[in-house]
Amino acid sequence: MSDSAHTGPTVDASGTEVDVVIVGGGPAGLSAALNLGRARASVVVVDAGRPRNAATLRSHGFLTRDGIPPLELRKLARAELAAYRNVRVFDRTAVSGLLSTDSADGMRFVVALQGRGPGIPPAVAARSVLIATGLRETLPGIPSLRAYYGVTIFSCAACDAWELQDRSLALIGETTDLAARARLIARWTDRLTVFTNGSDAVDTVEEAELTASGIVVERRAIDDLEGERGAVSAVRLADGERVEIEGGFVRPQWHPALDFVTALDLERDRFGNLVTDRSGRTSVTGVYAAGDAASPGPQQLIVAAGQGARAAAVIVHDSIGVRTAH
């Protein structure tokens, strides 16, 4: 990968210098912070405090923590980090810019901050930066969808389908991978209806394949969802017809949260995610990515945490010139 970076405008980071700045306080960022702290690196974690899974009541598939509320998992992780004096967490703080520098003392980056908490400096200088900001998501424009999201409507089959198995389920989406997601969800139920909400997300060949598998494809536009206290009970179509369901999944449109990296020439894929090698190195030396900020795979906390731990090990090895693939 290229070693090039663009030098940006000067930002005063005097007095605040660390080995690594981690942008993002989710499972990838916190896991990396723990492992970097244990490697005696000085670390700052910048956490805006807006996790994508904030609406989720229970997280699943995390070994020893199956069913834990995601906010509780973050609380436990933060308590563990408190034991490492070389790790600091800047709460309610956003990164407004990531700039390269040619400092003689090895500080290759300046991370400009916008903090709402007390004692947040305007910037931090760092030898390396790990981007673990995850994704932003946009849900289909269904009025009451948010009322059920994270309770009986979910986005991750691997995370939440077990609790919905053998029920009448909906899959709602407007993206071209909807048929593939339907085939995945069908592992857990034989009563699945795919709602394209008036879009052409499922083509005629895919519809025939899904129908042959017992999956119903409903192309009419959705008016709204029905239910009480987060428990969805029906999809109401624009013509007034109701399709009763007992839960379901939605396919959001995901967008990388990377507005702050525009000053660096970081390679992106066609979806705007950061391109990395298998160890989390981006196209700019000293900048790494973990979790969904890089090309996303399974949307699970344990996967993101594992990627953060691997990136931490690679950062430590790279800092002493020990090249490793990990």
PLM region spans:
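Residue-level detector of alpha-helix initiation sites
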Residues: 26-27, 137, 176-177, 294-295
